[in-house]
């Protein structure tokens, strides 16, 4: 698993990383941190948490950061209610606005809180969310974020087929 997730991370960097880009150092630092965390991970959950943090932070660096605080339509803050996640729009939509949009992917507020924490906290900081996360939560988040990442490139992420095998 460690090798395949490392391969996945490398592939994302080769797709979105641009040589001589002002954010190259930030991307390199993130790459180093995620590989270090994957190498020292004691469980699949630890590997996946490192990769989820990478997915969220990498998309933020390259300008495709996700919105988890407010509805992308009405801009109202979404607190402890369920919401919908729009891959096309890059974030959450409240139930009221979704009546018009028809986004199918319902997102529980605890899942949103988990991803928000993964995106906001320092890479090496272990939050309560890291400790409470289950393999299933990590798997759902990884797949959701991978789908979002895939929607921003016309290149196929090849390593994902091995991870899903």
Per-segment meaning from a language model:
Residues 1-165:
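Non-catalytic alpha-helical scaffolds and adjoining flexible linkers that form interface surfaces
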């Amino acid at each position: 698993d460690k090798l395949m997730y490392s391969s996945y991370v490398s592939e994302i960097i080769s797709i979105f990383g641009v040589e001589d880009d002002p954010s190259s150092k930030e991307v390199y630092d993130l790459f180093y941190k995620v590989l270090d965390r994957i190498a020292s991970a004691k469980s699949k959950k630890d590997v996946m948490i490192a990769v989820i943090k990478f997915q969220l932070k990498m998309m933020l660096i390259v300008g495709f950061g996700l919105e988890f605080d407010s509805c992308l339509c009405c801009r109202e803050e979404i607190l402890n209610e369920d919401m919908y996640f729009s891959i096309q729009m890059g974030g959450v939509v409240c139930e009221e606005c979704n009546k018009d949009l028809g986004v199918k992917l319902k997102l529980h507020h605890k899942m949103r809180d988990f991803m928000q924490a993964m995106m906001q906290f320092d890479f090496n900081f272990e939050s309560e969310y890291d400790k409470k996360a289950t393999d299933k939560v990590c798997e759902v988040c990884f797949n959701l974020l991978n789908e979002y990442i895939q929607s921003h490139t016309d290149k196929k992420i090849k390593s994902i087929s091995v991870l899903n095998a």
